[in-house]
Amino acid sequence: MNKTYYVCKYTPIELLEAFGGECQNLNEMPQGFDHADQIAHPNICGFGKALLEAVMSGKVKELVLVNCCDTIRSVYDILEDSGKLDFLYMIDVLHCDAECSRERTAVQLKGLAKAYGEYKGTTFDEEKFRQAFKKPEHIVKPHISVLGARMGNELFDMVQKSMPYPVENDTCVNNRSVGEAEPPKDLEFDELMAWYAKELLGQIPCMRMMDHSGRKRLYNDPGLKGIIYHT
């Protein structure tokens, strides 16, 4: 069974797992961009090229994106045109947590559920949905935090080996905080998606969100001994 890859903390992983999906964060850097350089503008960022390379090399067959930046929009257009993926979907999330944004996100979730369910040939399993919610684990003892731009697994491994304290990757998708609350019971699907949209948008905000004051949680930590800011 193919894994469904994602790159954004606002990806509804729990919903995908409710339809039988196995999700994995795509966060590796390739050895080069031989494939990506043939199909994308040379000015596209390294992360965008890494996504293209992973797909064009055949590693990724299922990918769910969120429109977090112009690069992702460009990557989506290129991949849609390439026809290399068995399943490709992009969720359009507004950069705020207002009521209208929650309503729009709920609509997007239902659209994804329909498309993914048809692709998988499965229906929504509420029990699997509930089981997919897991409380985030954080380092509570003295540690160092990596903040800022997304840091790939390879570079993070190097940082871990060179620091005197345990290191927590708090960049981008790695500070996903869905799972701090369990889904309420006895809700219809539409009501459940409305609740879920609120949970997704209520996470520690991405740097691209209009109100990112909630990111203070990342450094107002009594166990934090230092910060590495990745640019």
Predicted feature descriptions by range:
Residues 1-231:
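An N-terminal assembly and electron-transfer interface module characteristic of large anaerobic redox
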